[in-house]
């Protein structure tokens, strides 16, 4: 009997992979509900069919709080087996976009050379609709990023070596009262040394931090993740425009001061704004690629001691840190299209056009 009880307890423990107590979620301590494959064999890409029935970053999803909630996929880079470097692809709601923007698409990377860099796409992302996220190594230390089979623009992570030694997909949230009801399906990986794709992340296990949760629904290809999925919001679910916490029309300097505050620096210094193009700004921060649009952009740069509390990072990865914070603000709309933290100053001479 004792042996049977011990065996039962051991089996239960095996199912409860990396489950943490309910400490709460914050911008400095994100919560997750994922399936994760650490120290995987060498891979060169990943695919996940992502869907959300609900994605709200807080109990007040139409109010700007600096929080976000994501449904996403990470593919490790540079031989990292646990999340030091990566490319990610998925959907988000909340910061750095205004709460009124609703759900948007994004991708981001963290590279050995240049730190964290995020790219947001203000497009219509619907609930209960499947979107295919794909990340694929193309050689020359570069990865292409796709949504539904289409290369994003921008959509190339450069100076980011292969191989991948971890794959992960699921939810990430910065607020204990976030609401997520998501799924991932048809998980694939690309084998070493070729273009062969195969289904199943056979080495992955559910990982969650309460109140988030995740589990396989058809291992090792399909999973679900949830976080307060059925709790009623204080506001209606229909997204609508709200007044930003920043008064007046979009102001790049005000935006970077707010970004600095949210990323641990109350007194940023030597703030500089340069009128340029998005492509030139990418080149200036070491991310130049042919697929970056030539749209007019304000590159805003600040210095200080920044910790990327607002960075979308895999569980267990340290928040990106650096002395340089930069935003790319669309000159027409005032929307933040890209932002990053680095220890490398932008090459300002590259942005003049």
Residue ranges and their predicted role:
Residues 243-277:
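N-terminal trafficking/processing presequences and adjacent post-cleavage segments
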Residues 1-22:
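Secretory targeting and sorting signals
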Residues 268-327:
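Exposed beta-strand-loop-beta-strand "reactive/processing" segments of non-cytosolic proteins
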Residues 71-79, 264, 315-319:
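Short, solvent-exposed secondary-structure boundary motifs
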Residues 22-244, 330-333, 344:
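Exposed, interaction-prone regions of secreted/extracellular proteins
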Residues 314-353:
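A short, surface-exposed interaction/processing loop segment used at functional sites
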Residues 145, 308-309, 336-339:
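Short hydrophobic/aromatic-rich beta-strand segments that constitute the beta-sheet cores
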């Amino acid at each position: 009997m004792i042996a049977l009880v011990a065996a039962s307890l051991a089996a239960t423990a095996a199912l409860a992979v990396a489950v943490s107590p309910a400490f709460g979620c914050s911008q400095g301590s994100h919560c997750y509900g994922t399936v994760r494959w650490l120290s995987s064999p060498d891979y060169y890409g990943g695919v996940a069919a992502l869907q959300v029935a609900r994605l709200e970053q807080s109990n007040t999803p139409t109010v700007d709080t600096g929080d976000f909630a994501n449904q996403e996929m990470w593919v490790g880079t540079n031989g990292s087996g646990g999340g030091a470097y990566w490319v990610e692809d998925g959907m988000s709601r909340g910061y750095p976009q205004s709460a009124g923007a609703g759900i948007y698409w994004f991708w981001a990377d963290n590279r050995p050379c240049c730190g964290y860099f995020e790219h947001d796409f203000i497009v219509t992302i619907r609930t209960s609709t499947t979107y295919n996220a794909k990340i694929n190594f193309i050689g020359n230390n570069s990865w292409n990023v796709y949504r539904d089979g289409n290369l994003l623009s921008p959509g190339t992570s450069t100076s980011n070596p292969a191989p991948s030694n971890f794959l992960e997909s699921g939810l990430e949230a910065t607020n204990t009262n976030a609401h997520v009801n998501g799924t991932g399906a048809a998980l694939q990986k690309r084998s070493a040394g070729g273009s062969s794709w195969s289904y199943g992340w056979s080495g992955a296990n559910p990982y969650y931090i309460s109140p988030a949760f995740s589990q396989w629904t058809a291992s090792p290809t399909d999973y679900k993740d949830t976080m307060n999925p059925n709790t009623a919001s204080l506001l209606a679910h229909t997204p609508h425009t709200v007044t930003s916490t920043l008064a007046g029309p979009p102001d790049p300097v005000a935006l970077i001061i707010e970004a600095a505050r949210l990323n641990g620096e109350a007194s940023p210094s030597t703030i500089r704004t340069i009128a340029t193009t998005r492509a030139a700004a990418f080149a200036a921060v070491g991310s130049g690629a042919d697929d970056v649009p030539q749209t007019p952009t304000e590159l805003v740069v600040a210095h200080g001691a920044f910790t990327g509390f607002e960075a979308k990072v895999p569980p267990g990865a340290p928040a990106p840190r650096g002395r340089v914070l930069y935003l790319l603000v669309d000159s027409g709309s005032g929307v933040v299209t890209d932002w990053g933290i680095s220890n490398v100053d932008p090459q300002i001479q590259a942005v003049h056009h």
